[in-house]
């Protein structure tokens, strides 16, 4: 029996990004099909689509119109496309949409903490919980109550998380990671980096991830 090929996967993304929810679910399905062939360790890296977003957030329709010039009808079509893609990969988007765009910096600080002081599986679980809270239930991912509920859900230390949110722990580390990836050409997400060498950009179907990972594993 062959030994599975070990792969490091850095998943660069933002909780605010619906395609990141689709992409992560697709990647997970691909890895399930490659079980026994590939042994992957996922690391979640920060990217902010709207780093200047204030605590009050912004209506999602107004935000997308201002940022991209899209009409509400165009946005509805895109939202339905994303919803269908999510359903294909096992991610259920909230039927009414997200409602508002929020700042995600504190969520990234907690994810960094989970990666530093927790196990990779806990960081992965927290990422999933945050994506479901925002895209699945339209909750506010900048709200400490929502963030702490996600922390509890995945079994991380709520007292430590509360202290992080009350201060500025891991703020510099998150900004450094964001700068690292943007300086290396990552300007859209999701970006999936395999073994720090191979880049897969975008929320591809699970079949595409499976094919790419299989090829990379054969070369490793």
Regions found by a protein language model. Give the residues of each.
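C-terminal cap of thioredoxin/glutaredoxin-like
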Residues: 4-12, 16-36, 44, 111-112, ...
